[in-house]
Amino acid sequence: LSYQDQYPRSYYQPYNAQTNPEGYTEGNSTIREHTMLKNAVEFIYDEVPLELDVDGNDDGYVDNVTFLVSGSPDGWSDLLWPHRWSLFSFNVFLNGSIVDSYNLNLASGGYFNVGTLCHEFFHSLGGPDLYHYAGSGPTAAGGWDIMDGSSNTPQYMGAWMKHKYGNWIDCPEITQLGIYPLLPLQYQESSCFRINSPNSNNEFFVVEYRKKEGIYEVNTPGNYSGMLVYRINGNINGNADGPPDEVYVYRPGGTTYNNGNLNDAIFSAETGRTEINDSTDPSSFLYGDFPGGLNIQEIGFPGDIIEFVYWNIFVQTTISG
């Protein structure tokens, strides 16, 4: 289904007195975007089959609509840039349900790919961005999560994102010493664990197994399969305003101020990185460089599963946050 708007492309690009006098300003960008999308929905309304269920949870709203605009994207955060939003300016209906949540994507310029579509659609399911809007601080997750640096073909979002925002998997907490096995992230069960920090009320750790196999995980950073360890701040949703971040992936050389090497973030006997604690590189530091108190050892070889040993050292230091 397609629709051609009454205005030229320049109408939906930023105003410039010399080069684009008909462009939008901060005061009218929303109404221009929403009017265009309203007109598009109304134009194709009669072509949508009446038997098509557009409201799977029966809340009165269309579950989601994706608009694909011809051409390449403009600059980041401009109107013609891939994004997820809400069509709140009008009451627009499809098959008796209100069109509200939508994704806007561009058809060319390198941004129209499965990775971008998945990234934007996970926004519609509640997932936040894991990159920094202002570009400040070290990259927190990078190519380990589709909500930071999406690939084409896309990689998965991390286990914590699946658990918290998708409600697709459980993330059981480890409280006892022992040997623990992990299945690869593509499995629904036994693919992650949560470990609380003894030194923080709001920060904790998540471990997961990233195995380079199948369609989606072969494009993860680096050359190895193995265990990924990252820090979660339970008081924050996403990384857009970070740092501090909700999700931070540990990697050699990574600190509060330095990026380190995300390509080497994998732990395994194959990489030679088989433990993480407050003395290793990377260490299990909390935000603000407080020691995290994590102690994982004897991380094994990646196979059908990967195993690790958890030692709870119960060393209490200054409480962070």
Where are these regions (language model features)?
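Intrinsically disordered, low-complexity, compositionally biased regions/tails
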Residues: G27, I31, G60, F90, ...
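A broad, structural surface signal
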Residues: K38-E42, D46, G115-H123, F267, ...
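Extracellular low-complexity, Gly/Ser/Thr-rich intrinsically disordered linkers
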Residues: Q186-I313
